[in-house]
Amino acid sequence: MATVTVSEISNQAAILRAELKEWERGFAAANGGKKAERGDIKKVPEIAAKYKEYSRLKSQESASSSKNDKSHSKPTDTQERSKKRKHSSPNGPEQSQSHCQTTSTPRKSAAGIFQTPSKLKTTHPADVDPYDSPSVLRRLFSPSTHMQTSSPLKTAIGPTPQRDGKALGLFDLLSESGGSTATPTAARMASLKGIAAQTPSKKRKMDTIREEDEEEEDSPRVERTPASSGKKYMLSALFATPTAWKYSSIVDDGTSRGVIGNNDVTKQSPQATRNIDHANANLETPSFLRRSTSGLTGPDPTDMSPLPVRKPQQFVGKGLSQLVQGLRDMEEERLEDEWDVLREIEIEQTGTGVDVPNSQAADPNSTGRTFKKKGQKRTTRLVKMRPVVQAKPTTTRSQPQSLSQSEPRFEHNLVSAGGSGDVDELGIDDNDLVAVAETQADGPPSGRVGIPAAFIDDDLDSLRSISEAEQDSDSDPDYDADSKPLGRSKSFSEKMKEAIGATGQGSDTKQAQERQKVKAKEKKEKENIDTNAKKPSTRKINPQAHANYRSLKIRNRGGGRNFGRFRRR
């Protein structure tokens, strides 16, 4: 009846477990792989009730299974149990014979009756929280989790192998002849078992198997084939970093004479030494490619002490900063010479240089350049060049004609009294006349009528002197600025025409025509002068310009005389 009850309980628990697992998978899929927690289970009352029922069934199943195990256990012979399981009880074989009746399933360890109770390693199902997931309960109640097995890491990872107090590397465990020292052979294990049966006089270490010489080898194992010279060379030179300890500890067999690893100096031949030097010379890095000359072993292979390390060769010449500074000094000297030449040329052009006599006599013995204190170089000063306004001349004066040119023309015109309408008797075109102000009264002079030709020469000389004086005279700018622009004075030809025309016939009509022409030209020139007068220029304002541009201090500019880089601080 009890067996049927246990099977029913296990079936119900399996059904509940399948339902709970299905719900857990659905919850994880809905929440992005998140597992159901205690709070999530409490939110669904049906699932919470199933969890409680599942924990109750599991506790009943465990209680009934323990009762069945106790009732169906049969007493066995103590001798047979001692043969099969020597240490079924934790206290040894003696106690296991006394309380063999209380032993449980082989999967579980038996508990001693007279043993001091200790804290249980597993929690009773009644004490387990009913909201724990089935995976937690399965881990708690599965017998495989309670079996006392050693951790795989403890067997895989052992202590660091050492020899003579020094840690061994991976390649140091390899023997020179190529045999493996880590995995023992069957023959060696048999020999070691025979040794272990004897009474040990001293505790032996089994961490590594030392290779023995042929004379000292008493074990019944078969001798190993000696490794070839190529294999020995590859192991010693390429696959392992040669250290001083390795050369001193490894003892090779008798076949390798004069090769690396043989510490016997007497057995080495000079030919072998030469071979070693040649091999090292081919393998070592060239001197020009080394970063630093490290300590090398001496020519004697038995000498374990390295040579003293050479210090790196120091740079004897100038450094880069000194070379750059020297180039800068040379450039400054060259610029100083150029500035001196420019200053001398400037002084010669302006003529402002004053020679000051030297108060100190020059030393005749001294050679080289005289010392000159270096001052401020390449000084830039702000110079505001304002435009200079010059008043334009208001009138254009005709060039004075010389007497040598005017007198022949005068004589020619006296002979030929007739002429065209545009060209007068003196041969002067109306286009050559410029509007000038009248300097003499209109009409012929009262005292000139009927003057003989003898007095005309004197009048010509006086007129020429007057006209030349007027041309040479300078105008007063203050007076000219206030007064109206005046026309030019009459030229020599005009004055001569007036003087001569007073005596000729029809002079009044000609003079009236000439006056009208002169007045018309004066009017035209006056209009031109008014239009060409300087008008006040309107100030153009850029609408995109900054309003406070003058108040900005841009690169220490525009701050006044004592505001630059070299101002007094």
From Swiss-Prot:
Biased composition annotated in UniProt, kind: Basic and acidic residues: 67-81, 481-498, 511-533
Biased composition (Polar residues): 89-107, 142-153, 350-369, 392-407
GO annotation (BP), single: DNA replication initiation
Entries under Pfam families matching the protein: Drc1-Sld2
Record keyword Nucleus present: yes
Recorded family membership: Belongs to the SLD2 family.
GO molecular function, one term: single-stranded DNA binding
Keyword Nucleus: yes
UniProt protein name: DNA replication regulator sld2
